[in-house]
Amino acid sequence: ENFAGGCATGFLRTADGRCKPTF
């Protein structure tokens, strides 16, 4: 699965390009 941020499921891409968990 590829998302816009390239992060794993349950993670969001932040403005600085990192992935952070949404929980």
UniProtKB/Swiss-Prot annotation:
A Gene Ontology term for the protein's cellular component: extracellular space
Family per record: Belongs to the GBP/PSP1/paralytic peptide family.
Disulfide feature: C7-C19
Designated name of the protein: Paralytic peptide 2
Keywords (A to Z) from UniProt: Cytokine, Disulfide bond
UniProt keyword annotation of RNA-binding present: no
Organism name: Manduca sexta (Tobacco hawkmoth)
Function according to Swiss-Prot or TrEMBL: Causes rapid, rigid paralysis when injected into Lepidopteran larvae. The physiological role may be to reduce hemolymph loss following injury and promote wound healing.
Keyword Transmembrane helix: no
Lineage per the UniProt record: Eukaryota, Metazoa, Ecdysozoa, Arthropoda, Hexapoda
Gene Ontology terms for molecular function: cytokine activity
Tissue: Hemolymph.
InterPro entries per record: GBP_PSP (IPR003463)
Top-level taxon: Eukaryota
